[in-house]
Regions:
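Low-complexity, disordered terminal segments
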Residues: 1-3, 20
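Nucleic-acid-interacting cores, centered on viral/eukaryotic replication and modification enzymes
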Residues: 253
Length: 350
């Protein structure tokens, strides 16, 4: 699959788009999309038929993640076909800079990831100190529970999709909602990581700038390495679930990116989208911050149900998302202040 994707992108970049070559590109895209859909169908059959246990949770997790990855690849291809012709128009699309086009085509993936992962994980969220032990310590390790997991708007869908996660009548891994949302988010992160580093590196680097580009690389690598480990051993679910929840702001960011590409960010609709992005970011990333800090301070890091070899990684990876959220919040507030104070207008006049 990976080699087919590379060959397709290489052929697309090195083809002069005449009417005949355009048909060839469309044919290749259709063939590639059909291949992905067949793989997704096989994975879906496996996921629906599989009842995961503690020993098989990783295989189940990666199957879901790969299904999510293929979904995002397919959505990216569809966006590249639909946006230039139907949403923007070919003339308007040609006027956009290449890095701006790349961002706009990527926006639907951000929206899908934010809505899917950010909403599905809602059933797993809890506020500190609801998971504290009697000794006043926050339990970050595995908890055995007999309660039914899932529920809410996605309950029926999750029960159909996950079918299990129990061993001897007790849950021994993450909540079903956490497993599904985390796997879906990891599939998106893998798609975006390959886009950043291989498939569209030049445009992504220009769009984000070198510093933000490197931050995004680190932001993607850490969850891809640590979330599967945490899922396998049932540890640090509180922090993982809230990390996935923060992806909800990606949906608002993707909508904002589309507005920028269409040139309507300064209209009343653009203002609503901007305010929505700031509000959602604060809601899912900044509002829970105090709970996160208290949880890290009160966490029982050396509990018996936490493998010792995980501790060095946890001490580094758990605080990083909170620090990045604060850093990005100050960047957002700086941009808001420029708009309010008229800094952008003065710069244009100069």
């Amino acid at each position: 699959f990976f080699l087919a994707r590379v060959k397709f992108e290489h052929a697309l970049r090195n083809t002069t788009l005449t009417p005949s070559s355009s048909r060839g590109v469309l044919y290749k895209r259709a063939h590639f999309s059909l291949t992905m859909m067949n793989v997704m169908k096989c994975l879906k059959s496996y996921v629906l038929a599989h009842e995961y246990t503690e020993e098989t949770i990783l295989r189940y997790f990666f199957s879901l993640a790969f299904l999510s990855f293929l979904t995002h690849e397919l959505l990216h291809l569809m966006s590249a076909l639909i946006f230039p012709k139907y949403l923007f128009g070919e003339k308007k699309w040609e006027k956009l800079a290449k890095h701006r086009r790349a961002q706009v085509v990527h926006a639907p993936n951000q929206i899908l990831n934010g809505l899917l992962a950010g909403q599905v994980v809602r059933g797993s969220l809890e506020r500190f100190p609801s998971a504290m032990k009697k000794n006043g310590k926050f339990d970050v390790g595995r908890r055995l529970e007999t309660t039914t997991r899932g529920g809410g708007l996605f309950g029926g869908f999750l029960n159909l999709l996950t079918k299990g996660g129990v061993l001897g009548g007790k849950a021994v891994t993450f909540r079903r909602t956490t497993v599904l949302a985390t796997a879906a988010s990891c599939g998106y992160l893998m798609y975006d990581f390959l886009l950043l580093t291989i498939f569209d590196r030049k445009n992504m680097l220009r769009a984000h700038g070198r510093r933000q580009y490197m931050i995004y690389i680190m932001h993607h690598v850490l969850p891809l390495l640590m979330w599967p480990v945490a899922t396998r051993y049932g540890t640090f679910e509180y922090f993982v679930a809230w990390g996935v929840r923060s992806e909800l702001s990606q949906a608002a960011m993707g909508l904002r990116t589309v507005c920028i590409g269409m040139g309507i960010l300064d209209t009343i609709y653009g203002v609503i989208v901007q305010l929505n992005f700031v509000g959602v970011y604060f809601w899912v990333r900044m509002w829970p911050l105090l709970d996160h800090v208290r949880s890290m301070a009160k966490a029982d890091w050396f509990a018996e149900n936490v493998p010792r070899w995980q501790l060095p990684f946890a001490f580094f990876t758990v605080p990083v998302p909170a620090m990045l959220n604060v850093y990005w919040w100050f960047m957002i507030m700086g941009a808001v202040w420029k708009v309010v104070s008229g800094g952008n207008k003065k710069k244009k006049e100069a």
